[in-house]
Amino acid sequence: MSSSEIYRYYYKTSEDLQGFKTAAAEPYFNPMAAYNPGVTHYQFNGNTLASSSNYLSANGFISFEQASSDGWISSSPASHRSESPEYVDLNTMYNGGCNNMAQNQQYGMIMEQSVVSTAPAIPVASPPAVEVMGSSNVGTCKTIPASAGPKPKRSYTKKNQPSTTATSTPTAAAESSASVNLYTEEFQNFDFDNSALFDDSVEDDEDLMLFSGGEDFDGNDGSFDLADGENQDAAAGGSGKKRRGKQITPVVKRKRRLAANARERRRMQNLNQAFDRLRQYLPCLGNDRQLSKHETLQMAQTYISALGDLLR
């Protein structure tokens, strides 16, 4: 990009425009001449050097005036991280301003490392209690217990899927009730099975996403030969019908898309409800501002660790 293209986006002040008015070659005032400076020719060793901008200084660097702001090359201060006093560092509030390196960071990744390092010191937070917070299909926030045997093979039919979820959740609930009584009565009596809190997992064969198994691909042209016939019969889940040449109609695709959208909407609503329930138990800062999700989790971690220190 030449420097004349740069200065097309370089906003001039009114003083610069007046300077262009007197130095312009035209008899009339052309305001666009401020954004397309004329070509000046320099002589160097008998060769004519055409510089497309008279803002290119002798040392080759582009020199800017102080009076005007370039909105293109350097970012404005408003686009940097907000310096508003609404951001409260919860670590310095609760830990009395410790000088640890991890405590002074404002970002989430360093926070998580420091929380992980302090978490094993709390004896009351037992890992089997966390198992209630995830169904058997979600692999994000589930801790695998040490006593669990080999995992049963997952089948994509409706028959035996809810039974595994129903058997795993009461055992986890029984283990969590045996742990230290840290939670309120409302939390312990919460019905995790029937509250539709974790039904975002893909259990139904009809509600799978657009590409489910081998049924979306036409196996005859050879472009999507993902498996041979025996494997595709086995992938049909014992339903007895071959899926190879089956085309999905746009109506079915639209139904699946709508079902996936409804699942995602329900998941986000449940997540927001869980955050609202968590904000009820956390101490508020008193500045009439609802904590963001990141600040809520940060406050919850600090609050739980402070309660653990208090119990110890």
Swiss-Prot record:
CDD domains: bHLH_TS_amos_like. Developmental protein involved in neurogenesis. Required for the formation of chordotonal organs and photoreceptors. Seems to bind to E boxes. Specifically required for the photoreceptor R8 selection. Residues 255-307 form the bHLH domain. PANTHER family: BASIC HELIX-LOOP-HELIX PROTEIN NEUROGENIN-RELATED, PROTEIN ATONAL. The gene is ato. Keywords: Developmental protein, Differentiation, DNA-binding, Neurogenesis, Nucleus, Transcription, Transcription regulation. It comes from Drosophila melanogaster (Fruit fly). InterPro entries: bHLH_dom, bHLH_transcription_factors, HLH_DNA-bd_sf. Residues 136-174, 220-248 are annotated as: Disordered. This is Protein atonal.
